[in-house]
Design a protein with these regions (language model features):
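Carboxylate-rich, polar loop motifs that coordinate divalent cations or form catalytic acidic clusters
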Residues: 1-584
Length: 586
């Protein structure tokens, strides 16, 4: 028998049946009647069975709960119901599919009064982030902690892992093998010695591998397939002043003149050249780079060039800059920029992890503990002026690890507390933490790359973190703001005939306070239920304040000893994605 019927937006007719877990639907265009039965868990027959329920949400989903249980959504492509929770009987089945009621709000959040769990909220979002894990069975281990990333000109991805194995994946990210000591990419054999900390491919197609403790490796392809390489390892030799200055190579870089530079963690910087006999020489502080400030800046971890003819070195004691268009290394003049306690325009922190020149010819420095620094100017006498950005400006953490620029000139920064996007034109940050990413991630130092397809790859303790910046969309939802409570002299004000409030505070347009009621608080809330803990607020009392007060996530404001007058309280908020949309209430 048919107990009730419902016609959905597409004119499909749904019939309630008295058999538990069973529902029928009729397509008037095809004349087909389909009977569906959803598996439900056993329950005591003496208990009342949950009722039939059906509704459609703002995203066009049709939700059906047959009599007795089996909460499902309708797949219009496959023309069948799909159980909302894990399949009954599967090992990870956790939830009852029996509900008493369901409701979808204006944002599409699904609210359910369930048979056993009480009230539950389900939110939906596209997840543009993914993780490529070298050894899936060991999520956070040395086998998955990424220290170096490079995409070569054939689209192969070179992945340096902390376990010392340099893995290579093809353009489809299928595992090809690892680099062996004899230069072959294979799944067998002795891995090439050394943990890769930085990898580049130069303009001639040569792969350069910076290792921690095992020097610098030059890998020149010996086959068109890119499966074999001639390897040359360069090491520090105490009795050879033209050898590599230190075996701990943290970064390798090719400048605009084709020079290869190596930043070492105990010997400053080097660049490679050759003598008349073709022998490779490393030019460093021990021979011709006499001007390099080796004593304070011997721990170099990064090197790059800007768009103004300078090379920049990131060290643990600040940044070093010099002209890259030199003829004699002895004549190079170096400028050292560091944190000066009484200079607000100096670097915010001396531990510089990453430096990036942008398309708009700006330069940004990522520090380990001092946030982001933007170069403003360098005076003729070598004094640098910087503008710093910290957690107070929207960064999720002041510990920054690496930066990449997308095709819209936004900067993507891996931090100790998630990843964020910096929009230079607006000087604004958008953060993505574990709640946005939907899985835990802990980023590694100085491991990132931008692929030819525009994908961003960042190294993490659990693998390669992957996303395409153009696929990330912030919510445009504008939440209404309501006033939720009024407190006068630390006493809650309840509406009533003898009260200050004749109606609820949110329905009150005007409030009159006497001279002895000049200490009061107002609570407010933006009705965004997706991630309400991320909503941030600002307020202003017109007639008393001239600037907005940014209250972060605080949802109340208190005023004391206001002088006589008329005032208007206005409140603004972001939505739960952190977008400031200038919603207001007064």
């Amino acid at each position: 028998p048919i107990l009730s019927a419902y016609v959905d937006r597409s004119s499909e007719v749904w019939f309630e049946q008295e058999e538990p877990g069973v529902v029928a639907h009729f397509n008037p265009f095809t004349g087909v009647v389909t009977r569906e039965q959803i598996l439900i868990e056993y329950s005591n027959p003496e208990r009342s069975r949950p009722a039939f329920h059906i509704h459609e949400d703002v995203n066009g989903y049709l939700w059906v709960h047959p009599y007795g249980g089996g909460f499902s959504y309708f797949d219009p492509q496959k023309k069948r119901l799909v159980p909302f929770y894990n399949g009954l009987g599967s090992r990870d089945w956790r939830f009852s599919n029996k509900i008493h009621s369901a409701f979808s709000d204006k944002q599409g959040n699904l609210w359910m009064c369930t048979h056993s769990k009480g009230l539950e909220k389900v939110t939906y979002r596209n997840v543009p982030f993914s993780m490529m894990t070298p050894v899936p069975q060991e999520y956070e281990s040395l086998h998955n902690e990424i220290r170096a990333l490079c995409e070569d000109k054939q689209g192969n991805l070179w992945v340096g892992v902390k376990d010392g194995i340099l893995r290579i994946y093809d353009a489809d990210r299928t595992y090809k093998g690892y680099l062996t000591e004899n230069g072959i990419i294979s799944t067998v054999g002795t891995p090439v010695k050394g943990t890769a900390y930085f990898i580049i491919q130069d303009s001639k197609g040569v792969i350069w591998i910076a290792t921690k403790g095992d020097g610098l490796i030059r890998a020149e392809a010996t086959s068109p397939s890119g499966m074999s390489y001639k390897l040359t390892r360069y090491l520090h030799q105490e009795d050879d002043m033209y050898s590599l200055s230190d075996n701990n190579v943290y970064c390798v870089y090719e400048d605009h003149n084709g020079r290869i530079w190596a930043a070492t963690f105990a010997g400053g910087i080097n660049y490679l050249t050759e003598n008349e006999d073709g022998k490779v020489l490393f030019i460093n502080h021990r021979n011709h780079l006499k001007g390099y400030p080796i004593d304070p800046c011997y721990k170099a971890r990064f090197i790059t060039s800007d768009n103004n003819g300078r090379l920049w070195v990131g060290t643990t004691t600040g940044a070093v800059a010099f002209d890259e268009n030199f003829e004699k290394p002895e004549d190079v003049q170096f400028y050292h920029f560091s944190r000066m306690p009484n200079d607000t325009q100096s670097l915010s922190n001396n531990d510089v992890h990453w430096i990036i020149p942008t398309t708009d010819k700006e330069l940004y420095l990522a520090t380990f503990g001092g946030g982001l620094n933007k170069l403003i100017s360098i005076s003729e006498d070598g004094h640098g002026a910087f503008k710093s950005y910290s957690v107070q400006d929207g960064l999720p953490s002041d510990v920054l690890l690496s930066i990449r620029e997308d095709d819209k000139q936004n900067l993507w920064i891996s931090t100790e507390n998630g990843i964020c996007k910096f929009i230079p034109s607006e000087e604004r940050f958008e953060s993505y933490d574990e709640r946005s990413i939907t899985f835990p991630v802990r980023f590694s130092e100085a491991a990132s790359t931008l692929t030819a397809k525009g994908n961003m790859l960042f190294g993490a303790s659990g693998g390669v973190f992957i996303f395409n910046p153009n696929s990330i969309r912030k919510s445009s939802y504008v939440p209404p703001i309501v006033f939720s409570k009024l407190t006068v002299a630390n006493e809650d004000v309840v509406p009533g005939e003898q009260s200050l409030l004749q109606a609820d505070i949110d329905d009150t347009e005007q409030l009159v306070l006497s001279h002895d009621e000049n200490i009061f608080s107002v609570q407010f809330a933006a009705l965004d239920y997706t991630n309400p803990q991320n909503v941030q607020y600002a307020y202003i009392l017109d007639g008393f304040e001239k600037q907005w007060t940014f209250a972060d996530k605080q949802r109340s404001v208190t005023y004391t000893n206001l002088p006589k007058g008329e005032y208007v309280l206005r409140v603004r908020s972001t939505n739960s994605d952190g977008c400031l949309l200038y919603t207001s209430d007064a």
